[in-house]
Amino acid sequence: MRLIIKNSYEDCSKWTADYICNKIIEFKPTKEKPFVLGLPTGSTPLGVYKELIKKHKEGILSFKHVVTFNMDEYVGLEASHPQSYHYFMMDNFFNHIDIEPKNIHILDGMAKDKKKECEDYEKAIRSYGKIHLFLGGIGADGHIAFNEPYSSLTSRTREKTLTRDTIIMNSRFFEGNEDLVPKTALTVGIGTIMDAEEVLIMATGHAKAEAVHQAVEGGVSHVWTVSALQLHPKSIIICDDAATDELKVKTVKYFLDIEKGNIETNVSRK
């Protein structure tokens, strides 16, 4: 596992966007061999999406041969609902880049047969071989996507009941009304994420400090689903200073020292 520590959220966003940009460009994707990218929603990746849009508009990066799979979607919300993750992704990212609509994959929270929808999603991922890079964020309780505490670390895409904490946290997007927050969601599993060639997780702010501590210094446990990253051959957590508040001083020093040669991922393409 790599732990990248930056000064601020803005620095984390720029580093992450540069990293993704480099990966796509180095892959040299084509129609026959697209780059497959896993994506999250929420406030954490917004800065990354803005940076990637900027790179696209500057002619540095094209998404024409990029295929995306989103992590999750609320059950019961139409794609046109302002708080659906379909709407979020179109409004904050896809409408601003040159990605082919057919290459966008987001779970359908209105599917009549949710089990089949989840099984088909797994099949769609497998049809491309694998996800090359899965970007994600984590909750204060260490959940990735909607894999809440005590989720199986080998889980696949399925319907999950949201915890009380998650409903309270997400109510800020629903006029502060917890009753308006969907109680279940379709989500990729921890096993689905772990199958990716590479996993990159963003964690910023003091509220994520305990989750970062458990992910890096704690043992592997389904209580903190993010801890599964310890078993991944190529996982990265990028965080700001505030998110390291619960780490041991020697842990922070270790990662700062070992990453000195890797800390910058500047993109300079014309």
From Swiss-Prot:
GO biological process assignments: carbohydrate metabolic process; glucosamine catabolic process; N-acetylglucosamine catabolic process; N-acetylneuraminate catabolic process
Enzyme class, broadest EC rank: hydrolase
Any Pfam family hit: Glucosamine_iso
Domain of life per record: Bacteria
Keywords linked to the UniProt accession: Allosteric enzyme, Carbohydrate metabolism, Hydrolase
Protein name in UniProt: Glucosamine-6-phosphate deaminase
UniProt cross-references to InterPro entries, sorted A to Z: Glc/Gal-6P_isomerase, Glucosamine6P_isomerase, Glucosamine6P_isomerase_CS, NagB/RpiA_transferase-like
CDD domains, alphabetized: GlcN6P_deaminase
GO cellular component: cytoplasm
Function: Catalyzes the reversible isomerization-deamination of glucosamine 6-phosphate (GlcN6P) to form fructose 6-phosphate (Fru6P) and ammonium ion.
Enzyme Commission numbers on file: 3.5.99.6
One GO molecular-function entry: glucosamine-6-phosphate deaminase activity
Activity control mechanisms: Allosterically activated by N-acetylglucosamine 6-phosphate (GlcNAc6P).
Reactions catalysed, as given in the entry: alpha-D-glucosamine 6-phosphate + H2O = beta-D-fructose 6-phosphate + NH4(+)
Pathway: Amino-sugar metabolism; N-acetylneuraminate degradation; D-fructose 6-phosphate from N-acetylneuraminate: step 5/5
Keyword Calcium among UniProt keywords: no
PROSITE patterns reported in the protein's UniProt record: GLC_GALNAC_ISOMERASE (PS01161)
Signal peptide (residue range): none
Record-annotated active site: 72, 141, 143, 148
Site (Part of the allosteric site): 151, 158, 160-161, 254
Family listed: Belongs to the glucosamine/galactosamine-6-phosphate isomerase family. NagB subfamily.
